[in-house]
């Protein structure tokens, strides 16, 4: 269908790698819809040419920054300010209906059935389920809606300093009016939710259609071993509880995206791709040899407590589920 599209956004060359993997995963699962990507002037001309190979339409837009630095600081994610550029997706009136997907999402199955949904359809946010997560949503492009969103952005801003707060303010009836607009969680499976509700993931995770790599560390920031075809563990990263989704991301990246980047001179060759700052200062590593063992520094109980309170628990080490269970067992005996 030429009047419907999957839409994503990249504001720099680092996120463009995510967009390339997303687009490749949509094609891999044989979508019949067009693919469009919004880019900002910060995306290099060379990377834009690479995007044009995967996407049917590459559209440059001006950055609309919320400027809400206090809220962004509170969220510890100041880069989210520029994601208000997502509002431009409502101006794509050449399409009758679209599905927006963040560049840090990955498609695991055909999801063309999302176009049967109405605006605004989205999955609950794992942090506050009465709000929807704006990483995946169905919408209908409209100049009127676009202008109304700009007005809300200007007059009210965003309660979280990013696009999700603004969109939840605008579509404020999502939580209560129509359950049909609540997408199942499998259409926007948060990678950080896997650890927090492991039993549900074990029961339903096999049905996941889209995984969303929330958090500061993105798939392209990890180290990948081409021999084992697996991502190296990163200490207390909860995403590594079930790294299979990261491995799928990297498999698509190495087989479909790296050759494209090589074609445009963004990387020289696979063998020299270890520890190379290939695009816009963002490092993607391919570990071609032995992965050196790392020793974890000693952390006092007070430091551990402080890290817990800041949401930085060592999920893969001292604060793993098995270690917590052992500690609880000593008290219950």
From Swiss-Prot:
At which residues is there a site annotated Important for catalytic activity? 86
Cysteine pairs bridged by disulfides in the record: none
Chain sites annotated for binding Mn(2+): 102, 104, 212
Keywords for this protein: Acetylation, Cytoplasm, Glycogen biosynthesis, Glycoprotein, Manganese, Metal-binding, Nucleus, Phosphoprotein, Transferase
Its cellular-component GO annotations read: cytoplasm; nucleus
Q: How is it modified after translation?
A: Self-glycosylated by the transfer of glucose residues from UDP-glucose to itself, forming an alpha-1,4-glycan of around 10 residues attached to Tyr-195.
Classification via SUPFAM superfamilies: Nucleotide-diphospho-sugar transferases
Family (UniProt): Belongs to the glycosyltransferase 8 family. Glycogenin subfamily.
As recorded in UniProt, its EC number(s) are 2.4.1.186
GO function terms (MF aspect): glycogenin glucosyltransferase activity; manganese ion binding; protein homodimerization activity
Q: Which Gene3D superfamilies match?
A: Spore Coat Polysaccharide Biosynthesis Protein SpsA, Chain A
Provide the positions where the record notes the PTM N-acetylthreonine. Answer: 2
Known outcome of mutating residue 163 to N:
Loss of self-glucosylation activity and ability to trans-glucosylate maltose. Reduces UDP-glucose hydrolytic activity by at least 190-fold
Instruction: Tell me what organism the protein belongs to.
Output: Oryctolagus cuniculus
Q: Which gene encodes it?
A: GYG1
> Mostly located where?
cytoplasm
> Where in the sequence does glycosylation occur per the annotation?
195
Positions where Phosphoserine occurs in the chain: 44
Protein name per its UniProtKB record: Glycogenin-1
């Amino acid at each position: 269908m030429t009047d419907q599209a999957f839409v994503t956004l990249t504001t720099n060359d680092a996120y463009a790698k995510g967009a390339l993997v997303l687009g490749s995963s949509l094609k891999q699962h044989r979508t019949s819809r067009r693919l469009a990507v919004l880019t900002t002037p910060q995306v290099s001309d060379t990377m834009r040419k690479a995007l044009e190979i995967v996407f049917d339409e590459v559209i440059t837009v001006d950055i609309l920054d919320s400027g809400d630095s206090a809220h962004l600081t509170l969220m510890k994610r100041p880069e989210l300010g520029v994601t208000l550029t997502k509002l431009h997706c409502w101006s794509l009136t050449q399409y009758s209906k679209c599905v927006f997907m963040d560049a840090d999402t990955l498609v695991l199955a055909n999801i063309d059935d999302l176009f049967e949904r109405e605006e605004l359809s989205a999955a609950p946010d794992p942090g506050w389920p009465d709000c929807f997560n704006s990483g995946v949503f169905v919408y209908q492009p409209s100049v009127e809606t676009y202008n109304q969103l700009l007005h809300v952005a200007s007059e009210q801003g965003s309660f979280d300093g990013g696009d999700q707060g603004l969109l939840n303010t605008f579509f404020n009836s999502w939580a209560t009016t129509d359950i049909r607009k609540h997408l199942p969680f499998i259409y926007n499976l948060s990678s950080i939710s896997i650890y927090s509700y492991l039993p549900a993931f074990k029961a339903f995770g096999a049905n996941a259609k889209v995984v969303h790599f929330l958090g500061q560390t993105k798939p392209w920031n990890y180290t990948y071993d081409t021999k084992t075809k697996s991502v190296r563990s990163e200490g207390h990263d909860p995403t590594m509880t079930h790294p299979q989704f990261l491995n799928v991301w990297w498999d698509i990246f190495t087989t479909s995206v790296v050759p494209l980047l090589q074609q445009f001179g963004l990387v020289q060759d696979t063998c020299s791709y270890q520890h190379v700052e290939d695009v816009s200062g963002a490092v993607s590593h391919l570990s071609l040899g032995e992965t050196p063992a790392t020793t974890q520094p000693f952390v006092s109980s007070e430091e551990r407590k402080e890290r817990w309170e800041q949401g930085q628990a060592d999920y893969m080490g001292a604060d793993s589920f098995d270690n917590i269970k052992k500690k609880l067992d000593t008290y219950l005996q």
